[in-house]
Structures are given as structure tokens and as C-alpha cells.
Amino acid sequence: MLALTRKAGERIVIGDNIVVTVVSIKGDSIRLTIDAPKEVKIYRGEIYDAIAAENKEAAVPMDLTELTALKEFHIRK
């Protein structure tokens, strides 16, 4: 992990195509802009964590009897 200290107006460049700029600092809040290609997904940490939790919950293994019942339903049609 890299920890950096930046002042308002200063930038951090990540790779060749991502630039993070410190816009302002007020109290304990920092306002950033992130310039990145559209294909780079950018999430706030709490949103990313919520998405990961939803994906993990959705990936619960299925009971094989459910799949068998689905196959039988398709055959009866």
C-alpha cells in the first residue's frame, strides 16, 4: 500500500490513464476528482462493499433437487 500526502490542487497519476486530483479539503472531508476511462469502474468504498455482499449472497450454492425439478418442468411442457 502506498500512502501519500497531497494538498488541494495536487494530483496523483495511476498508470497511464487515471488521474486523481485533490479539489478541496474542509475539516475532515476531502473532495476528489477522478479522471479515468469509461471502462474503469469507480465506486465509493461503502458501495463497493454492498455490491460485493450482494454478489456473495446471490452466489449461494443451489440444491441439486431444485435443478432436477426445473428439468422435469421443461420436459412436461
Curated annotation (Swiss-Prot):
Pfam families: CsrA. Disulfide bonds: none annotated. GO terms for molecular function: mRNA 5'-UTR binding. Keywords: Bacterial flagellum biogenesis, Cytoplasm, Repressor, RNA-binding, Translation regulation. InterPro entries: CsrA, CsrA_sf. One of its GO terms (cellular component) is cytosol. One of its GO terms (biological process) is negative regulation of translational initiation. It is found in: Cytoplasm. A translational regulator that binds mRNA to regulate translation initiation and/or mRNA stability. Usually binds in the 5'-UTR at or near the Shine-Dalgarno sequence preventing ribosome-binding, thus repressing translation. Its main target seems to be the major flagellin gene, while its function is anatagonized by FliW. Homodimer; the beta-strands of each monomer intercalate to form a hydrophobic core, while the alpha-helices form wings that extend away from the core. Belongs to the CsrA/RsmA family. This is Translational regulator CsrA. It comes from Desulfitobacterium hafniense (strain Y51).
